[in-house]
């Protein structure tokens, strides 16, 4: 998100600006760096002033005028936008598209392979419960409002969160999901470096379609 500054239209325009991130090593910031470097020849890590911190702190710094822009989780962004002071500069999905990368899963539940083999019924029960929740989130508008109230979200903010997040939930992996993840990794590795990712390549067999 950025303040309503017409001079900031792309991530490349963050050059020389103050920008808030929740972690310099996060995938979000690595994607932002990759787009800025490949599309606008800007190294955000060196050519912008980066402030790390939690989302509420970044919001407060934006309100104080100490930042020109900030990352914002989609559970926070609707409330910031509702103030009328901020607008969306780019979404993570926009950055992926700008890099010419395929849509890929972003967050995962991971299981130890040996445990899965030893407890297939438990694994299946978890996946079934996950499917139930995804179906609920995709179809039940009121569920978002009710859960939002528990999180102190006004109804209009919860509705904004619903609009932002609902389409991001995946119910199953596509047949090309593992290959797509590897392509994203290979594109971002030169930006982040193996020290951030903790490996230089993704091994085969990290996903299974057996429990879909």
Model regions: which residues?
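Residues that form or immediately flank small-molecule/cofactor binding pockets and catalytic motifs
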Residues: 6, 24, 55, 93-94, ...
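A diffuse structural propensity rather than consistent per-protein peaks
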Residues: 9-10, 174, 207-208
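Short secondary-structure capping/turn micro-motifs that flank functional sites
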Residues: 78-79, 96-97, 154, 164, ...
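Conserved C-terminal helix/tail region of periplasmic/extracytoplasmic solute-binding proteins
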Residues: 182-212
């Amino acid at each position: 998100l950025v303040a309503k500054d017409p001079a900031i239209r792309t991530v490349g325009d963050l050059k020389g600006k103050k920008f808030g991130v929740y972690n310099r090593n996060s995938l979000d910031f690595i994607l932002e760096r990759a787009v800025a470097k490949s599309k606008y020849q800007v190294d955000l890590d060196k050519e912008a002033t980066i402030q790390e911190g939690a989302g509420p702190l970044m919001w407060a710094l934006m309100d104080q005028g100490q930042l020109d822009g900030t990352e914002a989780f989609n559970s926070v962004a609707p409330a910031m936008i509702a103030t009328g002071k901020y607008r969306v500069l780019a979404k993570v999905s926009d950055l992926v598209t700008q890099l010419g990368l395929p849509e890929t899963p972003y967050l995962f539940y991971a299981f130890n392979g040996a445990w899965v083999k030893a407890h297939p019924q438990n694994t299946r029960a978890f996946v079934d419960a996950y499917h139930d929740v995804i179906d609920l989130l995709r179809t039940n508008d009121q569920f978002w409002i009710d859960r939002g109230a528990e999180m102190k979200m006004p109804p209009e903010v919860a509705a904004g969160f619903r609009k932002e997040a609902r389409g991001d939930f995946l119910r199953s992996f596509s047949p090309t999901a593992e290959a797509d993840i590897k392509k994203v990794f290979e594109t971002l590795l030169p930006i982040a470096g193996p020290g951030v990712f903790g490996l230089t390549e993704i091994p085969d067999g990290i996903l299974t379609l057996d429990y879909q």
